[in-house]
Amino acid sequence: MMDAIFFDLDGTLTDPKLGITSSIQYALQRLDLPVPSQDELTWCIGPPLRSSFVTMLGGEARADLAVSLYRERFGDIGLYENKVYPDIEHILAALKQSHGRLFVATSKASVFAERIIDHFRLRDYFERVFGAELDGTRADKADLLAYALKNAAVNPKRALMIGDRSHDIIGAKKNGMAAVGVLYGYGSERELIEAGASHICATPRAVLDHISGRIG
């Protein structure tokens, strides 16, 4: 039986493609760098933002500046260029009713994650939203989940992580949690299996079916 369920945000609860990729394009443009298409930037959805910029920029030198420029646009515009995946509210309502403790665990800065959860009126489903600090503290998913488990007083052996990228799965496993991967976000089935996901769900409703079986 699972006592607590942790959901990733980007690519699991909401589809943030437009807001994230447009804000990355804005930052790159401000840095006078080549600007890839939005589809070419979807690999950036999920992992810590700074690490994605380090990869794109080829080093650490301007990564912090790129993050700051990204947030110029994201904080005012990109945050809301986002949408909740179909059936997510149904899933959350059902799990809340079945007495599972629900949490958000995202590498996104908590100040933005909180605003997204409030904007889409998802607050009532979650006991707490755990995210990174603006300085990058706890952007690593393993560190974030360790912090969340401790602060929520959750036994990792009775907790489940739901996410769409490998770092969600790896972070959970490092903390002794079970982890389920979803295919409707931005990670591939191969990525999730290789990371060690215990189960793969193609749709949000499949997530509910799987979790309900664990709780019931």
Feature locations, PLM:
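Acidic, Mg2+-coordinating phosphoryl-transfer loop and its flanking beta/alpha structural elements
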Residues: M161-H199
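Glycine-rich phosphate-binding loop signature in dinucleotide/nucleotide-binding domains
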Residues: Q97-G100, A152-P156, R214-I215
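N-terminal helical cap/lid subdomain that shapes the substrate entry/recognition surface
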Residues: M2-H90
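A short, structured active-site edge motif that brings together acidic residues
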Residues: R123-R138
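Short, acidic loop-to-helix structural element flanking the phosphoryl-transfer center
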Residues: D76-V104, S110-E114, A142
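Conserved Lys-Pro-Asp/Glu-containing loop-to-beta segment of HAD-superfamily phosphomonoesterases
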Residues: A4, D140-I170
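Conserved H-loop
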Residues: P34, R123-E127, N155, S198
